[in-house]
Structure formats: C-alpha cells, structure tokens
Regions:
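Conserved catalytic or regulatory cores that recognize and/or transform ribose-phosphate-containing ligands
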Residues: 1-134
Length: 134
C-alpha cells in the first residue's frame, strides 16, 4: 500500500475536516494510506526535536506529501522543504482566492487550487488516474 503524508497546520486542522475525509475515502479506494501527522501524533511544547524527528521519519516512509496551505504555515513549509530535498512528489493544496506561496509552489510537483471538498476530490482523483495509468 502506498502512503501519503498530509501536512497541515495544527491550529487550522479542524477547519479542513471535510477535505481530509474526502481525501481519506478517495485514497482508500486507490489503496493509499493517508497519514495526517497532526491527527496521529501529539507532542508537548518541550518535545519539538522529537516531533520533527518523527515527522521526518514519516515523510521518509511516505511515497508523496500533500500540503494544505490555504493558511500559510512555517511547519508545513519545513515539511515541504524536507520532502522536496528527499525527492518526494509534493502536492500543494490551497483554496481558491487564498494567498499563494511562491516558496511552496517552487518545491511542488503540482499546485491545486480548489473551491470545496468535492472539487478537491475530483482534481486529486484525476491526478491519481494519470499516475496509475502511466
């Protein structure tokens, strides 16, 4: 089973329940595990080194990274940079009309601006079909 690392700001995670649920269902149908780091792990404020060590290990063990950056996040930017340095495909997601990150897009395999969870699922679904047919 392939594995996708989902990078999202901890403080904004609850705003994207519909998007995460939609992707989780789509990926399950395509035999891909969606690992949402902020859902799987919890760290105390003094555990930042351990947190990043675990994050980097999870990225190393993933086939690609999906970054939700409707709201910019330093932590997600670090995860993108790490995945890019490890030659992992990076998919940069943001809601249409949100601020565009040139640094994140510069490290991305694909940039997906979406309206809602249905639009996101359809666009990612097309990308998965292209990748699986090639």
């Amino acid at each position: 089973m392939k594995k996708a690392y989902f990078a999202i700001s901890y403080s904004n995670r609850s705003l994207f329940d519909k998007e995460v649920d939609s992707l989780r269902k789509l990926f399950l149908k395509n035999n891909i595990e969606l690992l949402v780091f902020v859902d799987k792990y919890s760290f105390r404020p003094n555990q930042e080194k351990e947190m990043m060590k675990v994050a980097f290990e999870e990225i190393d063990n993933s086939d690609f990274l999906i970054a939700e950056l409707t709201t910019k996040s330093i932590g997600v930017g670090i995860e993108i940079g790490y995945a890019f340095a490890k030659n992992k495909p990076v998919f940069y997601l943001r809601k249409k009309d949100s601020e565009y990150s040139t640094t994140s897009s510069g490290c991305s395999t694909a940039i997906i601006a979406y309206r809602n969870e249905f639009d996101l699922k359809e666009t990612i679904g097309k990308i998965l079909k292209l990748k699986m047919s090639s």
